Design a protein with these regions (language model features):
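AMP-binding/adenylate-forming domain of the ANL superfamily
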Residues: 1-110, 114-123, 128-145, 160, ...
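Phosphopantetheine carrier-protein modules
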Residues: 26-27, 31-35, 55-62, 396-399, ...
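Gly/Ser/Thr-rich phosphate-binding loop
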Residues: 204-207, 232-234, 246-316, 325, ...
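Regions immediately C-terminal to embedded phosphopantetheine-bearing carrier domains
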Residues: 1, 5, 81, 142, ...
Length: 612
């Protein structure tokens, strides 16, 4: 599209392109050995839509979906759109109280799907497994409702307008590369906006969506095998997942021979040596860097092609898409001042046809973040950017991420890029830590080789930084991790790194490993009665705590991966694995019982284990 379509016309990019594929024999979905062609997929969506209509669902309603990774769930998303309703994907692994709160805030009228703990008062729509019907209808006012990540406070649901999302899908379908029919991996959890981008841009172009299991999603080697076996041509990945895949390829994982487009979003893109090496072996492939919060979805894009050696370490997030307006204002400004040719930096405001309706059921918060200025509506992104004369934007981090050390402003991304240039570094995150000496810089590192000595690596990195960075940019401390903690969105949890840096752990030197490991977990979970055979996730284990435990374990000469920690979620099973013995049957049963907890993890663990 050369310009934003605007208004109700943009909704035509949602359902009609899918319906246009009905007569084709092409495969719409693949999930393991199951293949579903376009016609069968649409008729299944039609049956679900008819069941929803029979339950009284119509335009403007909200439908809760159990967000499992199955063809029927994908069909249910399309069915909701056809009814004019908004799907509300809910992760069955979340606590029942949180699920109930989300459904209540969104005003969900019914729920579709099994295995989700919602109040009995919410009617369930059951669709016969063999039911099929012609799909008809069209999008209503909302395309979807998604609750943003966060473990405290009242849930915050973004209500995305159908015409706004339709603008993005229309841009995709008209794109010379992204608009082609492609075999696309459905990587993002359905509770995140990128999943809708994957779904509608793929099926609307006549492509094939390949569904991935959670175990494959968390394991980069298994994921590479799937990508190679299925001939996946397009990926949507957060930066941390792309890095993990690139590392796995370098370590001998299956090569993604058919890959031609990778779309990354969710956090600042680093063109690391591993990522460059991957694309150097994929001639003609393009790396697309997208930016956009859930409240607007994607609003800018930049393409990296050609020789990866020429790519900048921190690629820009690009220029505004046709349906978005972007302005840069002073970080403390109350008004939206047009960026124009200003080559400065500041707070990014987002406007245009891309904006969500707001936060469902929370008018005060909507008014706070979506503001009226100069006769237009703007979303206060909370992100800092730098703008070039041609409108190209560079992401500098969140307003809350800006650091000052001894009065000097510090950009963590610059330090992280320097660290990632070191041959032994797979990932790096730099955060500010407040202490007796004031605020200092702490570098958190995931090494390429998990067996590297921590002290030697920290010393080498300090020397490396001193040789390449200004003195005030050299981190004071270097922490070596098995993996970095991730939020549910797949982004690195920087706040968790800074918040938990001061928690001291006591390791019982000289004690048997089983006692040391159990004692460490009792400290982390504040659970003195924790038993060796107890499921750690039943006692509050979470992503950050797993990473901290494995990092401490590594300091004392033992290596356990994040994936193994989730596969064997008891101290006894993990110790058996570490000591090279057989894992007892009850440990394996615990591993099976831990599937629900691991689904909640829903992370892509880097090696050792949506739009921004």
């Amino acid at each position: 599209m050369s310009a934003a379509v605007r208004g109700a016309d943009a909704r035509s990019f949602l359902l009609p392109p899918l319906l246009a594929q009905a007569s084709r024999d092409a495969i719409a979905l693949r999930h393991g050995a199951v293949e579903i062609d376009q016609a069968a997929f649409l008729s299944r969506a039609g049956a679900i839509a008819e069941a929803l209509r029979s339950a009284g669902i119509g335009e403007g309603d909200v439908v809760a979906l159990a967000a499992s990774r199955t063809p029927d769930t994908i069909a249910a998303v399309v069915a909701c759109i056809a009814c004019g309703a908004a799907p509300l994907p809910l992760d069955p692994a979340l606590p029942s109280s949180r699920l109930a709160a989300m459904a209540a805030i969104a005003g969900a009228r019914v729920v579709v799907g099994d295995g989700i703990a919602l109040p009995p008062s919410l009617p369930r729509v059951v669709v016969d497994a063999d039911a099929h019907a012609a799909l008809h209808g069209g999008a209503g006012p909302l395309a979807y409702v998604l609750f943003t990540s966060g473990s405290t406070g009242e849930p915050k649901g973004v209500a995305m307008r159908s015409d706004a999302f339709g603008e993005l899908v229309g841009w995709h379908l008209a794109h010379p590369r992204l608009g082609r029919a492609a075999v696309t991996l459905q990587f993002a959890p359905l509770g995140f906006d990128v999943s809708f981008q994957e779904l509608f841009s793929t099926l609307g172009a006549g492509g094939t969506l390949v569904l991935v299991d959670e175990a494959q999603r968390r394991d980069p080697y298994a994921l590479l095998e799937l990508i190679a076996r299925e001939g996946v041509q397009r990926l949507f990945l957060p930066c941390v997942a792309l890095q993990a895949l690139a590392e796995a390829v370098a370590a001998g994982g299956a090569f993604p021979h058919a890959l031609r487009d990778v779309v990354t979003a969710g956090e600042a893109l680093h063109a690391t040596p591993a990522v460059r090496a991957l694309f150097a072996e994929l001639p003609g492939a393009v790396l697309h860097n997208h930016y956009g919060p859930t409240e607007s979805h994607v609003v800018s894009a930049h393409e990296l092609a050609g020789d990866p050696a020429t790519w900048p370490d921190l690629p820009p997030i690009g220029r505004a898409l046709p349906h978005a307006r972007l302005r840069v204002v002073a970080a403390d400004a109350d008004d939206a001042t047009s960026a124009g040719a200003d080559v400065g930096e500041g707070h990014l405001l987002i406007g245009g046809a891309c904006l969500a309706a707001g936060y469902i059921g929370r008018p005060a918060l909507t008014a706070e973040r979506f503001v009226e200025r100069d006769g237009a509506r703007w979303y206060r992104s909370g992100d800092r950017v730098r703008i070039e004369p041609d409108g190209t934007l560079h992401y500098l981090g969140g307003l809350d991420d800006q650091l000052k050390i001894d009065g000097i402003r510090v950009e963590p991304g610059e330090i992280e890029a320097a660290l990632c240039r070191h041959a032994d570094v797979a990932q790096a995150v730099v955060v500010g830590v407040d202490g007796p000496a004031g605020r200092t810089l702490a570098a958190h590192i995931v090494p390429r080789d998990p067996h590297l000595g921590e002290a030697a690596l920290a010393s080498a990195l300090r020397t490396h930084c001193a040789a390449t960075l200004a003195p005030w940019l050299v981190p004071r401390t270097f922490a070596i991790h098995a993996a970095l903690p991730l939020a549910a969105s797949g982004k690195i949890d920087r706040r968790a790194l800074a918040r938990d840096a001061d928690q001291a752990l006591h390791w019982r030197e000289g004690a048997p490993l089983a006692e040391q490991w159990l004692d460490l977990w009792r400290q982390l979970l504040d659970a003195p009665q924790l038993g060796a055979d107890d499921n750690l996730f039943d006692h509050g284990a979470r992503s950050l705590l797993v990473v901290r435990a494995l990092t401490e374990l590594r300091r004392h000469g033992h290596v356990l991966s994040v994936v193994q920690a989730y596969e064997y979620p008891s101290v006894a099973a993990q110790v058996a694995l570490l000591e090279g013995g057989a894992v007892r049957d009850e440990g394996r049963r615990e591993a099976e019982r831990g599937v629900a907890q691991r689904a909640a993890f829903a992370r892509f663990a880097p090696r050792a284990g949506g739009a921004r």
